[in-house]
Each structure stands twice: as structure tokens, then as C-alpha cells.
């Protein structure tokens, strides 16, 4: 795991790219081929170790998994099994470094110290699923029929190079454009989602609207970085081809469009998550729009802070210039777990139980990985997002998720995207 590729680091050296790939293959070979032979029967352990980078999955399990009891901030109980949460933030790659070091010791670790379940993100999922440290989902006794209602892209992201599914997610993360309703009414004369979409339907139209927004005193986006995910999700080639770094035409279009907007004073160059970038979450920030999936509304837009646009239900949602996805969390069973039955049950309940899925949508405003649940909620007129002024955005999420193309996903995405 220590030599697994975490990205291309901006290097265009052919040897470097080739060596990174061989490192993945070497690690998989060295770890053995026991994953396919893992015994999920017999006596199970009394300590269940979960590795993750934030509180999101912990809150989902606490709130929605039947029988989960919270003991303290890092401990829970499921029946007579003690659940231990090992939460390491992702800053400076700390989570992956900690996970890698622990997985290297997995085979020789004491039963109560073995990782049972760990989480991965889309940008680096292949780093883990292309090794034997992740269990094939089928080896847990989970069938294709069990997962039939899940969105295909969520399976593609955690399918290894041999076509074996190695992880499952409870959520989907299709993205949309969130716009400031007051700014839309003031500048465009309407805050109706269908009407606003006409002003952001493609990048040329989006850029024209940016000029109109500037004239009215608004930035189109808080930063050029707000649009990067949308462009990078719509590439027609991979970051590394034939052992060489490749910059897709759509990435270069982001560069040229962003420079044009910045030079015209229609956006800024703030880093995502920084204080300056967040100013647009408030009316005085004078920002027209942001891009994001369902989790962005809950975790990133200061919706719980009095005086923010979200607190007052002042955002609206519309599809925007192109469909995209951003983030998502996948559950992986760790090879060597002595709690395979519990791993299986958590995956099945948290990612396939339609009642639990709907409960997550209602209570957490999440977009869940269950087609029937999402289609039912999208048609439910009683479901409204407070942050979005009572709008039900689920139908546009449903439409967006079906169009996602992950054919150009690669193990180099995290590093190359971050360096670029």
C-alpha cells in the first residue's frame, strides 16, 4: 500500500508514471490472493474497527443503522460488538497515510486491531480497490441482485481492473448549480429554476451572464476553482495515456474560460474552503452561484448560520452548463476482517434498505444510492429543501446521475487534479 499511486504530482516523466502503476500491481501481488478465499462464516470478533476521515459516516450509522448505540465520540456498540472509530482528517494526505500504514500490518495484527471496514473517496478509490487489501463484495455474500437498484456510476468507481466490485456507497453525488435567488430576481428578473437555467445552459451563455452579473455588482462565482470539477468531469481522455501526462481539451477550456472571467473581474482565484471563498454564502458577499452535489448544501454553505443565504432559504438549484459529480464515500470491507457478517449487514442496510435510504434523504438532505427511493422522493411534493427555498431538487439530481460518464476515470485523478 505504501507504494500505491496517489497521483501524478504534475510530472510529465514517462518512467515516473509507469513505475507508479507497477507499484500498485506489486503491492497487490505481495499482499497475497486470499481475498477471494476469505471465510465469512464462523466465530466473529467483538471489536469492529472503522477507518474514515470525518464524522459523516459515523453520523449516518448512528442515526440510521438499527441497534447502533453511541458510547462516546469514538466508540459505539452493535449488540455485543464494540465499534471503534479511527477518524483521521484528510489534510496533507493524513487519512490515506494512516490507512496505508495500518493495512500494511493487517495480516499480522491482533484480531481486535484489524481494520474491518474503511472508507474511500472517488478520487483515490482505484488506489485501494486494485489491491487485495479490499474484499470483493461478492465474497461477503452480497449479490448483484442485492445492488440492482444502485446507480451504475457508483459501482464503476470501485470496480477493479479485473471487473470485480470492491466497494459500495449509500450516496450518489451528482452536482447542480446553486444560485442566489435574490441576485437572480434583481439581475435576471426571475428566480424560477427553469428560467434561470436559460442563462447558464452552456459555458458560452454562462460567461455572457457573468458579464451581466458584474455590471450589477455580483461575481458570477466566488472563484475560478468553483467550476473546475464540472469541466474535469466532462473530459474525453485520461490524465495519463501511454505512460505520459495528458491534459484534456476540456481542462484547457477551463483554463481559458477562467482566465477570461478573472481578467474581466467576474470571478476571483480564492482557494476552495477558504474564508474569502465562503463570503458568497452571505448576501454581502455578492456572489451569484456555486456548484455542488447534495452534500454541499448541508456541509459547506453555512446553512445553519443565522444571516447566511442558506439559513434564509435563499438558494435555488438548476442543472447548469454540464452534468458532473463531486465526491462521495464508499464502504470497503478489509481483507482479514474477523467481522465479515457485520460488514455485510452494514453494507446491505445502509446502501440497499429503501426505508433507511428515504430516511437519510428526509433527515439529512442527502442524495441516496437507490433509484426507487430517489424517484419516489423526487415525485413527492411534500419533500422540500429549506435551504433551497422549498424547492425539491431531486428530479434534477436523478436526471444528472444517469448521464455521468466515468470511462476516463484513472488512479491518477486525485494527484493530477490537485496539482493542476
State the predicted function of each range.
Residues 46, 73-91, 110-112, 190-197, ...:
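A local structural motif
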Residues 138-148, 156-227, 239-272, 335-341:
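Helix-loop-helix "hinge/cap" segment bordering the ligand-binding cleft or interdomain interface
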Residues 58-59, 66, 253-345:
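Extracytoplasmic/periplasmic substrate-binding proteins
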Residues 87-104, 201-205, 269-283:
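Short helix-initiation/N-cap motifs at beta->coil->alpha
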Residues 49-52, 85-86, 116-120, 167-170, ...:
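Structural recognition of the beta-strand scaffold that forms the well-ordered cores
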Residues 2-126, 144:
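Conserved N-terminal structural module of periplasmic/extracytoplasmic solute-binding proteins
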Residues 93-96, 107, 111, 118-176, ...:
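Hinge/lid segment of periplasmic solute-binding proteins
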Residues 299-305, 321-325, 332-419:
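C-terminal lobe and pocket-closing loops
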Amino acid at each position: 500500500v505504501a507504494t500505491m499511486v496517489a497521483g501524478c504530482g504534475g510530472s510529465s516523466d514517462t518512467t515516473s508514471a509507469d513505475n507508479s502503476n507497477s507499484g500498485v500491481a506489486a503491492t497487490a501481488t505481495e499482499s497475497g490472493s486470499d481475498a477471494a478465499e476469505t471465510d465469512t462464516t464462523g466465530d466473529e470478533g467483538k471489536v469492529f474497527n472503522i477507518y474514515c476521515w470525518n464524522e459523516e459516516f459515523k453520523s449516518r450509522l448512528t442515526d440510521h443503522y438499527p441497534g447502533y448505540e453511541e458510547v462516546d465520540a469514538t466508540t459505539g456498540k452493535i449488540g455485543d460488538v464494540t465499534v471503534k472509530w479511527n477518524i483521521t482528517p484528510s489534510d496533507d494526505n493524513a487519512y490515506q497515510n494512516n490507512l496505508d500504514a495500518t493495512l500494511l500490518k493487517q495480516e499480522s495484527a491482533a484480531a481486535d486491531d484489524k481494520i474491518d471496514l474503511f472508507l474511500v473517496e472517488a478520487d483515490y478509490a482505484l488506489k485501494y480497490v486494485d489491491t487485495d487489501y479490499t474484499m470483493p463484495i461478492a465474497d461477503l455474500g452480497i449479490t448483484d441482485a442485492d445492488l440492482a437498484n444502485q446507480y451504475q456510476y457508483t459501482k464503476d468507481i470501485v470496480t477493479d481492473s479485473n471487473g470485480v466490485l470492491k466497494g459500495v456507497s449509500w450516496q450518489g453525488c451528482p452536482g447542480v448549480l446553486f444560485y442566489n435567488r435574490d441576485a437572480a430576481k434583481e439581475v435576471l428578473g426571475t428566480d424560477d429554476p427553469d428560467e434561470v437555467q436559460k442563462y447558464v445552459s452552456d459555458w458560452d451563455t454562462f460567461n455572457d451572464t457573468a458579464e451581466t452579473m458584474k455590471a450589477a455588482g455580483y461575481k458570477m462565482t466566488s472563484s475560478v476553482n468553483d467550476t473546475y470539477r464540472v469541466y474535469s468531469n466532462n473530459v474525453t481522455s485520461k490524465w495519463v495515456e501511454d505512460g505520459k501526462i495528458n491534459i484534456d481539451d476540456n481542462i484547457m477550456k477551463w483554463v481559458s474560460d477562467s482566465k477570461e472571467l478573472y481578467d474581466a473581474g467576474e470571478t476571483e482565484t480564492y482557494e476552495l474552503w477558504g474564508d474569502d471563498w465562503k463570503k458568497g454564502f452571505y448576501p454581502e458577499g455578492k456572489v451569484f452561484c456555486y456548484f455542488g452535489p447534495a452534500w454541499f448544501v448541508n456541509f459547506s454553505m453555512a446553512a445553519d448560520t443565522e444571516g447566511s443565504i442558506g439559513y434564509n432559504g435563499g438558494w435555488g438549484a438548476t442543472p447548469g452548463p454540464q452534468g458532473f459529480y463531486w465526491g462521495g464515500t464508499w464502504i470497503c470491507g478489509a481483507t482479514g476482517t474477523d467481522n465479515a457478517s457485520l460488514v455485510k449487514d452494514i453494507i446491505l442496510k445502509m446502501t440497499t434498505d429503501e426505508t433507511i435510504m428515504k430516511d437519510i434523504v428526509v433527515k439529512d438532505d442527502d442524495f441516496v444510492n437507490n433509484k426507487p427511493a430517489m424517484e419516489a422522493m423526487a415525485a413527492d411534493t411534500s419533500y422540500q429543501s429549506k435551504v433551497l427555498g422549498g424547492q425539491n431538487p431531486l428530479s434534477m439530481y436523478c436526471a444528472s446521475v444517469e448521464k455521468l460518464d466515468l470511462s476516463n476515470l484513472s488512479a491518477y485523478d486525485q494527484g493530477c487534479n490537485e496539482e493542476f
